[in-house]
Amino acid sequence: MKVARTPHFLRNFSDLPTVVQKKFYKQLAYLLTDIRHPSLRAKKYDENAGIWQARVDNDFRFYFQIVDDTYLILSIIKHPK
């Protein structure tokens, strides 16, 4: 699988603390090897739009779509508690 990032994601990502960015890259590596990796807790977020949610850590989630052989990373946001 390949990875593509939206401009929206890139804007949000650049504003995040470095520690969160590093955690995201670790989680992205898990996603590329196994979408069912327990650390990701990946699940369908919006069935109609084909949007998935996965965990960065306790505080952040990232959202993506699967388009052909590409994970399109849509956004990364603080998880509301």
What are these regions (language model features)?
Residues 1-2, 38:
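Solvent-exposed, charged interface segments at domain starts and junctions
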Residues 2-7, 11, 18-22, 55-61, ...:
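Enriched for short, Lys/Arg-rich terminal
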Residues 8-38:
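N-terminal first-folded block
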Residues 11, 27, 33, 49-50, ...:
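A periodicity- and composition-biased signal for non-globular, repetitive helical segments
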Residues 25-27, 45-47, 75-78:
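Short, surface-exposed linear patches
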Residues 29-54:
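A short, surface-exposed loop/turn module that caps and links secondary-structure elements
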